[in-house]
C-alpha cells in the first residue's frame, strides 16, 4: 500500500485495533431476526396464544346456522337457483304456477278457500295477444321481402335522383352531345 493511504485516519485506526478485538465488537452489534429489544425496557416474551379455528369451504355452514336461528319454525328450503332461462322449463313453470295459485287463493270468513280465476284468464289472454302479434309481424316481413327484390333500378334512374341544378331534359341533351363527341373521336 502507498504511504498516503496508510497515513489516512481510518487506516491508522485499523492498525491500532487488534483483529480479535474487532471481531468481538462486530459480533456484539449484530442483531438477529429472532429477538429485538428496546434499550431501557424489559422485554416480555409474548406467550403464544392458541386459537381454535375451523375452516369450511364456502358459506354454506354459515348460512345454515343463521337460518336455523331466525327461521326455526319454517321448513328447510333448497338454496340456490334450480333453473335459469330455458335450462329447466318444467321446474320454472311449476314454480310460477305455485306462486300464482298462492296469490289467487283467498280465505273466506268461514275458513274455506276461494280461488280467483280472473287473473289466470288475464294471463292466458295476454299470452294469446303476444303470439298473434308475433305471427302478424312475421307475415308482414314475408310480404315485404319479395317486393324489394322484384324491382331493380337502372343506373340512369339513379343518376336522376341526384340533386342537380339541371332539369331532366337538359341532362338528356347533354347525353346526346356526349354521344356525338364520342362518335367524332372514333372516326378520327
UniProtKB/Swiss-Prot annotation:
One of its GO terms (cellular component) is nucleolus. This is M-phase phosphoprotein 6 homolog. Associates with the RNA exosome complex. Residues 174-188 have a biased composition (Basic residues). InterPro entries: MPP6 (IPR019324). It holds the Pfam family MPP6. It comes from Schizosaccharomyces pombe (strain 972 / ATCC 24843) (Fission yeast). One of its GO terms (biological process) is maturation of 5.8S rRNA. RNA-binding protein that associates with the RNA exosome complex. The gene is mpp6. The keyword Secreted does not apply. Belongs to the MPP6 family. Keywords: Nucleus, Phosphoprotein. The modification Phosphoserine is found at residue 167. Residues 120-149 have a biased composition (Basic and acidic residues). It is found in: Nucleus.
Amino acid at each position: 500500500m502507498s504511504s498516503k493511504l496508510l497515513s489516512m485516519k481510518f487506516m491508522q485506526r485499523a492498525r491500532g485495533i487488534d483483529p480479535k478485538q474487532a471481531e468481538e465488537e462486530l459480533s456484539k452489534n449484530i442483531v438477529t431476526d429472532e429477538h429485538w429489544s428496546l434499550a431501557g425496557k424489559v422485554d416480555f416474551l409474548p406467550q403464544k396464544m392458541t386459537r381454535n379455528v375451523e375452516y369450511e369451504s364456502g358459506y354454506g355452514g354459515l348460512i345454515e346456522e343463521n337460518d336455523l336461528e331466525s327461521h326455526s319454525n319454517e321448513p328447510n328450503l333448497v338454496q340456490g337457483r334450480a333453473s335459469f332461462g330455458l335450462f329447466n322449463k318444467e321446474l320454472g313453470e311449476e314454480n310460477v304456477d305455485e306462486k300464482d295459485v298462492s296469490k289467487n287463493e283467498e280465505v273466506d270468513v268461514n275458513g274455506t278457500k276461494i280461488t280467483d280465476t280472473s287473473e289466470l284468464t288475464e294471463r292466458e289472454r295476454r299470452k294469446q295477444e303476444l303470439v298473434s302479434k308475433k305471427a302478424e309481424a312475421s307475415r308482414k316481413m314475408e310480404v315485404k321481402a319479395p317486393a324489394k327484390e322484384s324491382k331493380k333500378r337502372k343506373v340512369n334512374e339513379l343518376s336522376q335522383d341526384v340533386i342537380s341544378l339541371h332539369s331532366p331534359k337538359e341532362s338528356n341533351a347533354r347525353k346526346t352531345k356526349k354521344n356525338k363527341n364520342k362518335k367524332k373521336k372514333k372516326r378520327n
